[in-house]
């Protein structure tokens, strides 16, 4: 009877295990042996227009530990360990921690918790992060050292690291990624979602001995990020950065920015900011070094703004290059007085002469012919007071007075004070005025391909006519007189046009004018404008006039840019510029 009762009890327990609790035990077992980890995509590559790599992903791995495997040093839990295996397993955490410290840095104690970590329920974990972005060659050394000691439980998965082969080249445009590989500045930030791609996931059945052959596996592949080709030309960018860096150093300016643009398309060929930084060492950069001054800084442009003023006046038929104007020594404005930077008596100037001599008085008198609402509309049509849509983070809008501006404000903005712009806004506006009158929104992205290699649509340049071709020709005539005024302003072999700018700067600490912004915009060739260069130096200490400190920099850049982009030397001489007239 006793034997029958015992057999009955065992049969009941077997029934409970097999029929009633079997699903729960199976699920628990599956959970214990299922291993899963993320698959990291390659971040999209960024290159210049000619294929020079500016940002890329290099092979690296994410190193992780399997504490359960380490606790048995790879011996399958279904196998009983002998004395030697038990002794080896007991030594594994310490030995593996020493190997990790040797190749990853730190002390063995830094890794002990990683190789022995437990889940909330107290059981040993199957996954413990050790280090991200470990160079592949470093992991190879770790793997070989572990194999030599017959230690198990350290694994790795693809985890590419971001590199910037060109260092500081275009770093204020490209930006950088943070320690987690997330874009934190420049295009790396604004295009982070597209560049990042999509993580994948792999799961498989594993024992403490490792992956179970023919076990249940699932794989969702990672999708690599989108590759971007920029409009930038790395060679031109280097020329511009070197020229700008020298100018900022020589003048002891607080900062500087320079742009080279194709006036017929709006493509940015170079965009430099100084001081700058190395994208691969962003952690040691200062705030001033990381700012893209060409996009993020708004400033009063000074006399370069006269190009925009004359374009509006010429388009309305209020002036031509040969219009006559009597320019007195000074004029009253808003309870104050407007004077020119040079002392003079009464002058009889053409409009061409007003621009060549950069007369604030002459510009103000001519601007008073136009009503304020019309002037405000033209400035808006030229893109001032609005972001350009270039796609770079932190773009400033600047500030432009509206139709209700005071008379004194109208007078000021005519010659570039009382409003603020960014360098990219001003460059795009001047490009529109000299190219025949069509505004092309500036672009920095040329093309893109997704992780599958398929072409992806990118925002193109939006175009609109802002002045007539006739008005454009009149303004080019005026701007050529600026260059021919002095023999050392020309670019050897080319007829070019340009405009100097010297503006007082507002000091926020006192809300008063203190210091200067010196600038020059140059375009070539005069006969068929193609390439624009705009240089701005903020608060230079040694010299402050645009003609003295910014013009030579633009001249140096243009002497390289014009032949580089296939612009043939000029075969004609500039026409005689009539600047003054006899009454």
Each language-model region and where it sits:
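Short extracytoplasmic
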Residues: 34-59
């Amino acid at each position: 009877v006793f034997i029958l009762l015992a057999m009955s009890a065992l049969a009941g327990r077997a029934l409970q295990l097999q029929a009633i609790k079997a699903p729960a035990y199976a699920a628990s077992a599956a959970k214990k042996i299922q291993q899963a980890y993320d698959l990291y995509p390659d971040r999209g590559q960024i290159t210049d227009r000619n294929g020079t790599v500016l940002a890329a992903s290099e092979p690296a791995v994410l190193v992780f530990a399997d504490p359960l495997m380490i606790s048995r040093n790879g011996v399958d839990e279904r196998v009983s360990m002998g004395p030697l295996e038990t002794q080896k397993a007991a030594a594994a955490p310490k030995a593996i921690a020493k190997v990790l410290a040797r190749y990853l840095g730190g002390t063995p104690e830094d890794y002990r918790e990683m190789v022995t970590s437990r889940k909330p329920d107290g059981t040993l974990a199957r996954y413990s992060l050790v280090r991200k972005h470990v160079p592949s060659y470093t992991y190879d050394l770790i793997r070989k050292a572990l194999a030599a000691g017959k230690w198990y439980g350290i694994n790795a998965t693809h985890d590419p690291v971001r590199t910037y082969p060109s260092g500081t080249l275009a770093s204020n445009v490209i930006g950088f990624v943070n320690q987690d590989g997330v874009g934190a500045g420049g295009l790396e930030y604004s295009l982070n979602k597209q560049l990042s791609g999509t993580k994948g996931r792999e799961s498989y059945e594993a024992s403490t001995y490792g992956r179970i052959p023919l076990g249940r596996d699932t794989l969702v592949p990672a999708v690599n990020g989108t590759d971007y080709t920029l409009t930038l030309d790395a060679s031109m960018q280097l020329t511009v950065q070197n020229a700008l860096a020298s100018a900022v150093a020589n003048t002891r300016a607080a900062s500087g920015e320079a742009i080279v643009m194709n006036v017929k398309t709006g493509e940015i060929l170079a965009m430099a900011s100084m001081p700058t930084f190395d994208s691969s060492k962003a952690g040691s950069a200062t705030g001033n070094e990381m700012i893209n001054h060409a996009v993020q800084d708004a400033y009063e442009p000074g006399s370069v703004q006269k190009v925009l003023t004359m374009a509006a006046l010429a388009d309305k038929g209020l002036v031509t290059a040969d219009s006559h104007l009597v320019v007195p020594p000074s004029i009253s404005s808003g309870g104050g007085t407007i004077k020119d930077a040079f002392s003079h008596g009464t002058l009889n100037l053409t409009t061409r002469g007003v621009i060549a001599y950069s007369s604030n008085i002459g510009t103000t008198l001519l601007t008073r012919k136009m009503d304020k609402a019309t002037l405000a509309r033209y400035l808006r049509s030229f893109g001032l007071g609005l972001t350009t849509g270039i796609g770079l983070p932190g773009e400033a809008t600047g500030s432009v007075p509206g139709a209700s501006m005071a008379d004194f404000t109208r007078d000021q903005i005519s010659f570039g004070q009382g409003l603020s712009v960014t360098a990219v806004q001003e460059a795009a506006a001047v490009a529109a005025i000299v190219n025949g009158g069509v505004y092309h929104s500036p672009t920095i992205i040329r093309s893109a391909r997704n992780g599958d290699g398929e072409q992806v649509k990118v925002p193109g340049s939006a175009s609109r006519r802002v002045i007539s071709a006739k008005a454009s020709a009149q303004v080019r005539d005026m701007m050529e007189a600026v260059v021919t005024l002095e023999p050392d302003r020309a670019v050897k072999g080319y007829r070019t046009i340009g405009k100097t700018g010297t503006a007082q700067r507002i000091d926020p600490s006192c809300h008063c004018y203190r210091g200067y912004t010196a600038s020059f915009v140059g375009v070539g060739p005069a006969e068929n404008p193609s390439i624009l260069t705009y240089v701005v130096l903020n608060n230079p200490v040694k010299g402050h006039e645009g003609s003295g400190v910014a013009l030579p920099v633009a001249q140096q850049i243009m002497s390289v840019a014009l032949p580089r982009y296939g612009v043939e030397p000029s075969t004609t001489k500039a026409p005689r510029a009539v600047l003054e007239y006899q009454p």
